[in-house]
Amino acid sequence: DEPMIWRYFVAPLPTKLAASQLDEREFVARFVIRINHTLDGAYIFSSGKNMGVFKANGFPEDVGEYYMLENYEAYSWTCHGRYPTNTPGWHPFALLDTTVVHNGEISSYDANRRFIEMFGYSCDLLTDTEVITYIIDYLGRKLGLTYPEISNVIAAPFWSTIEKQEPRERERLTYLRNAFASLMVTGPFSILVGYTGGLMALNDRLKLRSMVVGEKDETVYIASEECAIRVIAPELDKIWAPRGGEAVIVNLNDGGNK
């Protein structure tokens, strides 16, 4: 059966927003988390202004037909087409204009969850991927870290690697690892993060999950396997496998403003 989905285009009531003394994004984020935590039988899975999330249980071609994806245009797309084996939740997971798809299993989930829930988040959607979304939202939107800095928190370099850096870089990496130790993600994983104006791909430090990046003209393709890229773009200008813990960050020339 088709999923039961209601779509609304809304803005916070000005009086409620003013009374909350929050900015609009924080107001909406808190509302989404509250609904997902308190309302049984329903949840919000798409809450961005410039980000649409499409979820369903079925074959990819049927999902595309149901949502009429041929009518949409976007500068970036992320997709997760494999049903999870360890949890009943499935990807992508999103909050506001950030979305995450994930291949792997997070052994640090409980430690990450306990820490992030101290800051108003609530992990209720039954998958370890959800906590990565909240970690990125917390570090990026609330604390103002850049995506290279976020990658250094999530896939923090080994201490032996940090010690080999130049003094300034060593100091920076040491600070990030000490300050956000509870947000380091351990276990085998590869993630793809979509955000306004770009994408970030990241492997665990030991590269226990595969990830391949290809380029053709002005387009970048990222997948778990090269064959998935070749189906879409048989001829590539460049293809490579990023090292473990090495973030691949792709930004639009105009910053996603067009």
Map each language-model feature to its residues:
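Conserved short alpha-helical segments that host acidic/polar catalytic motifs at enzyme active sites
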Residues: 1-258
